[in-house]
């Protein structure tokens, strides 16, 4: 049994279908919209759902917005992705989204993905920018990076209810406070170097010879429209009321 965990909304979505909310393509354009979800009523609703899964949810962190890289060309429109083999995580909604964009989504572990990128067995991948930098993907031929912000992946801090029941109230409060502090620091770290007024990480990536393409709102909408059937399909799986509540929260945050 695991006592405490920090999990990705992507990794836990097979067990908790509502967590696919964050993987809806182009749900929120920026961190402000994500904050409106994880710090508002939607976040509380998701915590209530998680509470029924045998865990006590403590805090939301962030793994980052997943951006797109490849070894072939700049991606500015869905047509640029046609036929490209893109390594994705093993999630059905990702398969649907990249298939809708004309790509060839390829599921594989991250350990297998890196040599596959190096040999060009796959053309590209999608991950938070911190992963791109830490893994030095520019050395694996990933010379083009597209900032499209198609989904953000929150982290969730939880503790087993079995363990929680054994703790005193003082211990519970201490663990909750520690988790919330760690999550707050994680949110800051996840956005460092890639935010307006602080693009040091992006500059470092560009200095390594990577061509960075930042989609305009108009270009992003073309991708959004192309994946709308996927969005609607998965909204029904997640729960349309929850999705509508999320959309309203994001709109209010603009």
Predicted features and spans:
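N-terminal secretory/targeting leader peptides
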Residues: 1-33, 41-44, 48-254
């Amino acid at each position: 049994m695991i006592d405490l965990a920090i999990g990705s909304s992507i990794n836990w979505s097979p067990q908790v279908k509502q967590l696919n909310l964050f993987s809806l393509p182009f749900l929120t354009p920026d961190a402000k919209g994500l904050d409106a979800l994880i710090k508002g009523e939607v976040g509380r609703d998701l915590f209530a759902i998680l509470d029924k899964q045998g865990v006590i949810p403590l805090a939301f962190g962030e793994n980052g917005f997943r951006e797109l890289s490849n070894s072939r060309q700049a991606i500015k429109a869905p047509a640029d992705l046609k036929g490209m083999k893109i390594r994705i995580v093993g999630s059905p909604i990702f398969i649907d989204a990249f298939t809708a964009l004309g790509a060839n989504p390829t599921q594989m572990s991250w350990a297998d993905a890196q040599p596959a990128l190096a040999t060009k067995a796959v053309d590209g991948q999608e991950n938070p920018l911190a992963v791109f930098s830490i893994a030095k993907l520019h050395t694996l031929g990933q010379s083009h990076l597209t900032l499209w912000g198609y989904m953000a992946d929150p982290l969730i801090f939880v503790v087993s209810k079995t363990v929680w029941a054994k703790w005193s109230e003082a211990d519970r409060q201490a663990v909750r406070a520690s988790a919330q502090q760690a999550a707050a620091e994680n949110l800051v770290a996840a956005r460092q170097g890639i935010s307006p007024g602080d693009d040091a990480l992006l500059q470092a990536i560009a200095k390594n010879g990577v061509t960075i393409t930042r989609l305009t709102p108009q270009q992003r909408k073309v991708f959004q429209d192309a994946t709308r059937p996927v969005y609607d399909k998965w909204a029904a799986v997640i729960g349309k009321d929850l999705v509508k509540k999320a959309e309203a929260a994001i709109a209010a945050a603009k």
